[in-house]
């Protein structure tokens, strides 16, 4: 939701010079520097061939490798994360990726005497939540609405609505609700200033 055109078009409107009008514009000006930074981050990645929806929120991302391997859907929040783009990383819509997450799309073949480079894509489905300091290894698919607990190391696929934690990541007994309608970007102050006032 960081796109200026989207926020301006969908902004909350209040009677001119009313308390709500003045308060909303004060918040908008106060949060403008962060909004500009997030738009620049997204623009820089898109300029290098990444496919990022205008309504996605991009934090301080470190992206090594071919940027065209990165695809991020609408209303997805990406914190301070690191992408290893040797192969595709596809992140769906309404996904929340917290700070410190590392996405690795390549490793080495331990059975090969020449220790060859092996790469494989990572797929994150809609409404997934990847918590702080998790590591997502090559070839992993994280299902719709799945949760990866803080510090988890994910080397195997995570099913829809499953909750995993630990090193290596293990499925917990409880499942997440399947009725998901939230937008992780709507909680950011800059977006709230425009959309709510």
Predicted region positions:
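Glycine-rich NAD(P)-binding loop of Rossmann-like domains
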Residues: 115-124
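Short, surface-exposed alpha-helical recognition segments that flank or form part
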Residues: 67, 119, 137
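Domain-scale signature associated with acetyltransferase and cell-envelope carbohydrate enzymes
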Residues: 1-104, 110, 126-127, 144, ...
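Beta-rich strand-turn-strand
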Residues: 132-156
């Amino acid at each position: 939701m960081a796109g200026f055109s989207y926020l301006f078009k969908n902004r909350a409107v209040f009677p001119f010079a009313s308390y709500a009008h003045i308060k909303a514009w004060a918040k908008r000006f106060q949060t403008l520097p962060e909004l500009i930074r997030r738009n620049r981050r997204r623009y820089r990645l898109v300029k290098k061939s990444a496919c990022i929806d205008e309504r996605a929120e991009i934090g301080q991302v470190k992206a090594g490798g071919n940027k065209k391997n990165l695809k991020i859907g609408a209303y997805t929040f990406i914190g301070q994360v690191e992408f290893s783009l040797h192969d595709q990383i596809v992140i769906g819509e309404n996904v929340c990726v917290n700070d410190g997450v590392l996405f690795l799309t390549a490793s080495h073949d331990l059975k090969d005497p020449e220790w060859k480079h092996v790469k494989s894509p990572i797929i994150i489905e809609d409404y997934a939540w990847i918590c702080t300091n998790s590591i997502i290894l090559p070839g992993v698919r994280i299902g719709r609405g799945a949760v990866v607990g803080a510090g988890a190391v994910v080397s195997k696929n995570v099913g829809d609505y499953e909750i995993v934690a630990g090193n290596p990541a293990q499925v917990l007994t409880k499942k997440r609700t399947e009725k998901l309608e939230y937008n992780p970007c709507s909680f950011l102050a800059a977006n709230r200033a425009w959309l709510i006032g």
